[in-house]
Amino acid sequence: MAAIGVHLGCTSACVAVYKDGRADVVANDAGDRVTPAIVAYSEREQVVGLAAKQSRIRHVSSTVVKVKQILGRSSADPQAQKYISESKCLVIEKNGKLRYEIDTGEETKLVNPEDVARLIFSKMKETAHSVLGSDANDVVVTVPFDFGEKQKSALGEAAGAAGFNVLRLIHEPSAALLAYGIGQDHPTGKSNVLVFKLGGTSLSLSVMEVNSGMYRVLSTNTSDNIGGAHFTDTLAQYLASEFQRLFKHDVRGNARAMMKLMNSAEVAKHSLSTLGSANCFVDSLYEGQDFDCNVSRARFELLCSPLFNKCTEAIRELLRQTGFTADDINKVVLCGGSSRIPKLQQLIKDLFPAVDLLNSIPPDEVIPIGAAIEAGILVGKESTSGDDSVMIECSAKDILVKGVDESGADRFTVLFPSGTPLPARRQHTLQAPGRVSSVCLELYESEGKNSAKEEAKFAQVVLQDLDKKENGLRDILAVLTMKRDGSLQVTCTDQDTGKCEAITVEVAS
């Protein structure tokens, strides 16, 4: 049976299909295996992908980019605030939710971020259907390890709205390991794997323990100040300085000219991963003046040396955080398009001279391929009633419940620390005054620092219409079960009356 894996990144999206025992990436209608995660709006239509990217220079205020950065977030979220401040497309808050205010020239449209993501997922579904047919809609969708529950939910709902049957959300580093069959080739062995993902806007690092075919995240770290776009911007700034040197005009304050240079720099960056030099030509960059500049790989590496240093220092910091040395790492998996850069690969190899550097699968395809393999496993399980051949067993963040201490201050209790092997079950007794007729159990997630400022509420269970007691306390027993597939089931029971309520929250495994 056929199945689909989709990776929606900040700057691009990619779809792979699992069929006849193997997973392969599918090229879109433009012949490209990776599609820009960009949506352009006009009065009559929405355009997704390369065409939207090409038209952005002319229609920047009606073209949405990097929607993943704002998906499922509120205006109070620092990352959303940063996105809003940098977005060329106006973002407003309406009825407590963020919306794009898009001026098409003929009318103004309010668009939900989830609708933008839905259009990108629809493009991925259309691409997959070109080889599988329209009956194949079972999908596994990848999510970053540091995504909160609201972001995961928004991503899954957008995929569902596009017509996909979402089998599971899977963390990106887990998908990368699946793509290489790590843990399946020697299912009884134990190893530590570094997953290095340099995406369009961030660097994500994870140390994974592989033991008896099962994965566990030991530590993870994401840096938003290093990404493929930062390498592109560095090269574009150099091109702008060269134009100023040659033509005595600084275009760095001209948004349209800089967007042209960014596009040219991006093409050159890709070329320099395989060639010793690249030509950057921009037609009519400023006041009709064409610009032609040749950039060598050596020049590019010199310009980007501060970014390379940030990447290697991030690896060293993650090792310190884990309590590891380089000798404790057995394999390194490269993900994300910018991890193709030869200089970066050499620097990583220098850090781990005795370690296999896995890059035989194109780095921008490895995550969707792993997702497609997981989808194939799940579809096969449904058809054969067999067990999963791969278990992804790890909670991503601390899961906490909120209570109140004797002084009335909020108190958070960690029930599932990040990295908890799954499945897992916990019990928690919540005490409330007997005189109240309703009790609310609030669930939070955090990065593990156990600070109230770090925690984000993602679900709650409310017991209502309880019989009041004249005095004393009421005991509410909460039973939380996190399954192997990542879903969290919560049941709250009033110990006096037996009245109970239950919810299920989907969590990426």
Swiss-Prot record:
Q: Which GO terms describe its molecular function?
A: ATP binding; ATP-dependent protein folding chaperone
Q: How does it assemble?
A: Component of ribosome-associated complex (RAC), a heterodimer composed of Hsp70/DnaK-type chaperone HSPA14 and Hsp40/DnaJ-type chaperone DNAJC2.
Main subcellular location of this protein, as a coarse class: cytoplasm
* Compartments it resides in: Cytoplasm, Cytosol
CDD domains per the record? ASKHA_NBD_HSP70_HSPA14
May I have one GO cellular component term? Answer: cytosol
Q: Could you tell me what this protein does?
A: Component of the ribosome-associated complex (RAC), a complex involved in folding or maintaining nascent polypeptides in a folding-competent state. In the RAC complex, binds to the nascent polypeptide chain, while DNAJC2 stimulates its ATPase activity.
Q: Which gene encodes it?
A: Hspa14
Regarding protein family, the annotation reads:
Belongs to the heat shock protein 70 family.
The protein, known as: Heat shock 70 kDa protein 14
Gene3D superfamilies named in the record = 3.30.30.30, 3.30.420.40, Actin, Chain A, domain 4, Substrate Binding Domain Of DNAk, Chain A, domain 1
Cytoplasm among keywords: yes
Tell whether Cytoplasm is among the UniProt keywords: yes
Alphabetical list of PROSITE patterns matching this protein:
HSP70_3
Matching entries from Pfam families are given as: HSP70
Q: Which UniProt keywords apply?
A: ATP-binding, Chaperone, Cytoplasm, Nucleotide-binding
